[in-house]
């Protein structure tokens, strides 16, 4: 069978579509945001492919797997087992790293366990057990006639007089010993000091090196090893300064006896007690109460609240500090920063063993005197955090916690034994810290010899293949030790894509969601080659994508539309790129052929050099002391290849700093920097990202934008409502009163099914309307509150035309292209792009001061060319009101319309972290050595 037949698909907004998809091809599904692409790809094709596979398993196995809901479709034929690679499922497990997710770490563990060489951490000598024959050969290789002695170390750096031991050695017939470096006669041994450390080595044999000594030496070594427990030393008698030969028959350091168990792969796993650093349990970081967070306001006194919860208002702790101030003679009313450093340390870390007289007043007003040490504010918080069972106390205390790399393993997560196993001069933590590109180069250049080369051959092949796949999807700048929870959606998705190629499956249907997200134009070609490679293996690759290169490279394109939401869900065009461009009804085709396009502004807004937001000396992650200058009142684009430092600079440094200063956010963590100036030009900073607007089915666009409040007030103002005494709360489905209590205002009831997915059935009482009968009797202009929530934004705009407060908010939702969503649509069903535009609309509808700093990270995710055009209109409108827009973006259509560009690079990871170009798009396009400039120049020449 060479095709997938879909008949009568009605999932979400799909309008009973029929479709024939060729198998073993690269298929791109495109269309406006919200047109039904994901409904077809994920909720129909993938869901059915996965469901059929899971249903073929036993009932016992099924209970452990989440079964997909059966899509609303008449018939699908020709499906293969399906694998979906989405962006949503980034791992939040702190133990997951790029190495563990891609399984490269498993191969590295095996490699180091089989061909690694353990070394002593103190003396940096290889730990190797030598045979007696090897020891004899080594001695016989010394110059002939050299006078040597063979010693057996019996005491190493141990205190004591050792009288008994010396007597025993003499009784065994030995004549001499070297005690603390001096040769002594055992019949006249010196008296040793009891409290000093001593080293005693017995002289087992003295000889001149000659070739016929082999048998004698073998016997002497045997005796020495038995006497010392496995160690022997050969020293020169003529030249004492010559380096001594130390031999060990144990797998141990001959100098200090340090030994490791047999090397096993689990010794190199930080998720196994055998390999994890015992201090941080293999997490690589430690939590501690940070004095910078605890002393929130050092410019005021302890009494006034320098430390939250320890001021006048908390009488118990305030009494403590008063007694402490009396004992150490400092003023509790002085600013904390003015107190002597020693006093500050006592307040934070405690008085040690020094006891202090504390006076406490009990409930009856009696003064009680107690003598004890002061534990210190930081220790007090740490103790309470450990002991408390109250979630609110724990959450409050957690605000003062910071994390730092583990002081024991330095963030490598492994125990000491694993950190000192080498291949050449490199350890496993060294390999994990390198960028993937460097790691691939290291293993390509690695030459092992003999038996080790044979053992490592297959392991190295697997490692190099997997690293090459990661490089091919544009992730060469990541390191294997990078925590999986710090990856962006696009990065996590491409890692899973690389893992799938590594798996080498054939005959599978892969469904991908915009794999080009977060990828610079430079890396796009490599990504497309990867997708084509998956197809060439014999798989059907279905990609939801808006990227022009991907659409042009596809074997078959499905364009869904014509509009979004209720206006979408139909197949507008399908076939090759040429067929799509020739179709007059396809918006995608119009943009591909150039009939429609996003215009380049005729002139750029000039910048005012006196009004700049400046951030200097930013050094977070890979930033190399970056000095950033953003023009106030302009639309600035921050560009650069993946991993060049854009997110670190904007999201981890600039945004949290501005948030602290402008929004008075408490305890926001930011990356290191030197200085920031220019924040006085703003009154607030807003980050408009693609995170969901609400995590529960109860939140919806009406509640998020603030529309629902005036709508409820309208219903409460209806004469019938007033006669019944209903207030606006009556029309909320979140509180008792007007909502249906059978389903608590959800409209559906969840039925748990153990071997099947949970089923949500409409509530029998309210028939899914969320409100009780009495509330639904109130009508405004003939409509109930439920009917209003079911309206699309477009219908509601017409319905509430006479109410400016509501109409304005609805108009902004239409301006950002969301005319099709329903007011009461659950926020969990909105795509990332839709959620972001709801936030944008909410901002647009507020009374504007023209002094806002907006930060957007890749706002074009999930947006079609037509949606991007609309988004840019909105952003330019915000800019025209005097606001400053900072956008991190790879999309050239956005970059070309910016007033100002800041390009980071030149490469990702360690090869990036510098600003390599700034200026208008025309100026940046001329910069040599910038990857962005190369693509931008081509685009600007098409004007």
Swiss-Prot record:
Keywords: ATP-binding, Cytoplasm, DNA damage, DNA excision, DNA repair, DNA-binding, Excision nuclease, Metal-binding, Nucleotide-binding, Repeat, SOS response, Zinc, Zinc-finger. GO terms for molecular function: ATP binding; ATP hydrolysis activity; DNA binding; excinuclease ABC activity; zinc ion binding. Pfam families: UvrA_DNA-bind, UvrA_inter. InterPro entries: ABC_transporter-like_ATP-bd, ABC_transporter-like_CS, ATP_grasp_subdomain_1, P-loop_NTPase, UvrA, UvrA_DNA-bd, UvrA_inter. GO terms for cellular component: cytoplasm; excinuclease repair complex. ATP binds at residues 31-38, 640-647. PANTHER family: UVRABC SYSTEM PROTEIN A. The UvrABC repair system catalyzes the recognition and processing of DNA lesions. UvrA is an ATPase and a DNA-binding protein. A damage recognition complex composed of 2 UvrA and 2 UvrB subunits scans DNA for abnormalities. When the presence of a lesion has been verified by UvrB, the UvrA molecules dissociate. This is UvrABC system protein A. The gene is uvrA.
